Structure formats: structure tokens, C-alpha cells
Amino acid sequence: MDKHARGDADLPPLTDHVDTDALDTLFGRDTPGAPRVSGASLEFDYADFVVTVESVGRIEVRDAGR
């Protein structure tokens, strides 16, 4: 099976690879005492992919082999 044709059930939970609450804190809305980070990005491995999350709201998912 082509790894890009997998269904959601075939992928491990995202929370096994990254703290989604931390992503929300870093890149979510400004809150009192926790301003949003600007001009930053975070990259992590997920399954056979590399995921890049940018503070401007852009999310890129690419093949880890590239």
C-alpha cells in the first residue's frame, strides 16, 4: 500500500509524537500571560512524514525520505 494512501486509522495518534497542548500554547491565540510566538516554526517526525508547523498558521507535511 502506498504510504500516502493510508487511512486515518492506519496512522498512530498524533499525540504519540508531539505535545498538541504545547503546540496550541506556542502557536495558538494570545492569552493573558502566554502570548503567541511569532516568526517561529517547529518540525517533528510523524509516521513516515516530517511535519512543519509555522506561527503564521501554515502546516507542511512532507515525505520523510525527501
From Swiss-Prot:
What happens when the protein's gene is inactivated?
A: The deletion mutant is hypermotile and forms only rods regardless of growth phase. The mutant has a slight growth advantage in exponential phase.
InterPro entries per record:
HalOD1
Q: Which UniProt keywords apply?
A: Cell shape
Task: Relate the protein's function as given in its record.
Answer: Involved in cell-shape determination. Required for the formation of disks.
Protein name from the UniProt record: Disk-determining factor A
Chain's gene name: ddfA
